[in-house]
Every structure is written in C-alpha cells, then in structure tokens.
C-alpha cells in the first residue's frame, strides 16, 4: 500500500504553512474498511489523534473533535492539522476539497453555500454530542454525517484538496439526497466572456431552489467566481468528452450546457428525461470544427437560447431548423456614460 498525491495536491502542498495544533486531541472514526486511511495517517504532521473503529469507548473528556470517515480514502500529511486548526476558530463542522479517481485527475471544490452530505468531515465534540443524541445511540458513521450536515451551526470549508478517493466521483458526492439539482457544463473556466457571464446563472438557479454544480476542465481563473456565487465545482481535463462525468447529468433536474462546444454532451442528453438549456455564445468561426457533433434534430427536452442575433445566425448556418430563443445577459451600458476625453499628447515628454 502506498500514498500518492494528485497534481493539484502536490501543487497546494508547496504553498501550505504549518500550524502547531498538537494540543488538540482528535479521533478518527472509521468503522469500515480503512487500510489506505491507516497508512496515510502514519504520515500526519498532527500527531495527537487516535484511529478508532468504535466511538463510545474512545470518547474521553479530552476529545475535541472527531473526523467521521464513511469509506476508505487517502489524505495528505497536513489533513489533520487543517481540521484541528478549523476547530480552533470555532467551526463545528469542517469539510474540504477532494480528489477523485485512481490518479486524482478529478477535483471537487466545495462552496460553503453548498455542502452535500459529505463522506468525510470533522465534527466538533459539542456538535457530535448533539448528533449522537439525535441518532439515539446508533453510531452509524453515515447517519452521524447526515445529521451533522443538517445540524451544524458554523460550517467551515477548507480550500485545500486534503482527501483522495480512489474511486470516480458520483452524484452523491456533490448533491444532497433530497434537493433540486442543477448541473452546469462549461468547456472552459477562464476569465473570458462565456464563463464569466455563466456565473450570473448560479444565483438565479439558487434562488429557484437548486443546488448548483459546475463541471469544467480546470481552474483557469473563473473558478473562484463560481464558488463565491454558491456553486460546487468539479474539474477534469477531459470533461467535454468524459462520459462518466456526464452521468452527473442523468441525476440532475436541470442541465445548462454553455456554448456550442458542449455539443457532444447535448447530443448524449438529447431526447432524455433531463431538461437541458443550451446557451449559445459562439461566433461563426468555430462551427466548421464542431458542426459534426451537433444533433440533426433536438428532442423536446432540449431548449436552445443565444446571447444575440450573431450567435443565433451562427447556429442557423449549420442547423437552420433549430428554434432558438434569446437569453441576453445584462451588463451596464457604458456607452451611455460620459467620460472625460483622453489625449495621449498631454503625456508626451518635452524631450
């Protein structure tokens, strides 16, 4: 057995700062299979902890927090340090970002405004006592996690990928069991027009009662905007063509596919039971390279909208029969404002 960090974890580790948390006594409660976890815990910088498979006998008065682990996983050497530090700030429920897949190529970034029922979370002693009382003495780790998620009063998200699940990410990792689910598909998360405009959809969907998850290739600038707006973000380099992650869409109540580049995903969902909004921003130039992936006809579940007449005409150049509505994003009309004239000659040197 060995531990290997994902590319994201290695990148983050180089920037992490050590915090002395050795006075905080923690339990790691993992009643199920925990071979990989046990190996990873050997390398923890925070040493004042104990791995247990039975909770009640180990809950002494000195225990300040318990890491609830419902399945085998690996963690970075700094994981318990970060969890202990979060407890010191007054948090009663602490979660973190995570890597998924054998090589950790899928990354999950959580938002404090959207916390699904986690498979692993740190719970303060005070919250744990309340949760165990509500669980009526049953120390089922999944039940404790479910109740802790619902009863937490001061939830804290650590913006570090401290955990690594060797399996692939699934819908239960990003959505709660009984919430309305919205999945946003974006072929890029850069600071360019389409992704930036897309962030405006997140608060709108949240106001309609949706839990929002964004799927994109990598953090290229706009990822923090989606997190701040209240969405969880899943990144994978081949997200546009990875059918396993499209499986998230089949468990969603609504899918927003951003730009024509998501044609392959729309084609897969075409005619299914999942409502799809295909939002077009694209000009003519890209269509010769993507036209062969665009469905010939669209099922009743797919609705196409564009940001204006140019984007509409671009799609009609290859699919003239598509019905396309207008969904215009609102931006300030700076052309109507009065700006003082700028004369570059004023700044030329006398020399």
List the model feature ranges, each with a label.
Residues 1-43, 154-155, 159-181, 187, ...:
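Non-catalytic membrane-proximal stalk/linker segments that position and tether the catalytic domains
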Residues 63-74:
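Short beta-strand-to-loop acidic/aromatic patch adjacent to the donor-nucleotide binding site
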Residues 78-105:
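Conserved donor NDP-sugar-binding/catalytic core segment of glycosyltransferases
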């Amino acid at each position: 057995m060995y531990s290997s960090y994902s590319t994201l974890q290695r990148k983050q580790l180089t920037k992490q700062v050590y915090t002395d948390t050795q006075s905080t006594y923690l339990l790691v409660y993992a009643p199920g299979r925990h071979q990989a976890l046990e190996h990873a815990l050997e390398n923890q910088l925070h040493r004042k902890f104990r791995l247990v498979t039975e909770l009640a006998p180990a809950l002494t008065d000195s225990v300040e927090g318990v890491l609830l682990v419902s399945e085998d996983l690996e963690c970075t050497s700094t994981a318990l340090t970060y969890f202990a530090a979060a407890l010191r700030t007054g948090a009663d429920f602490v979660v973190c970002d995570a890597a998924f897949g054998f090589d950790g190529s899928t990354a999950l970034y959580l938002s404090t405004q959207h916390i699904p029922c986690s498979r692993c979370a740190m719970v303060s002693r005070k919250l744990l006592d309340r949760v165990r009382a509500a669980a009526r003495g049953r120390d089922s780790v999944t039940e404790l996690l479910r109740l802790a998620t619902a009863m937490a009063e001061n939830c804290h998200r650590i913006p570090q990928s401290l955990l690594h699940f060797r399996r692939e990410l699934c819908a239960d990792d990003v959505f709660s069991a009984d919430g309305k689910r919205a999945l946003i598909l974006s072929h890029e998360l850069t600071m360019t027009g389409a992704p930036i405009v897309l962030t405006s959809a997140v608060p709108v969907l949240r106001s309609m009662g949706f839990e929002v998850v964004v799927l994109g290739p990598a953090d290229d600038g706009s990822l923090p905007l989606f997190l701040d707006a209240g969405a969880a973000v899943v990144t994978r380099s081949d997200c546009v063509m990875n059918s396993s992650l499209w499986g998230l869409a089949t468990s969603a109540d609504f899918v927003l596919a951003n730009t024509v580049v998501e044609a392959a995903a729309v084609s897969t969902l075409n005619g299914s039971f999942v409502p799809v909004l295909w939002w077009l921003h694209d000009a003519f130039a890209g269509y010769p390279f993507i036209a062969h992936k665009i469905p010939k006809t669209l099922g009743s579940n797919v609705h196409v909208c564009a940001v204006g007449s140019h984007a509409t005409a671009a799609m009609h150049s290859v699919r003239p029969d598509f019905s396309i509505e207008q969904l215009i994003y609102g931006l300030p009309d700076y052309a109507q404002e009065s700006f003082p004239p700028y004369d570059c000659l004023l700044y030329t040197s006398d020399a």
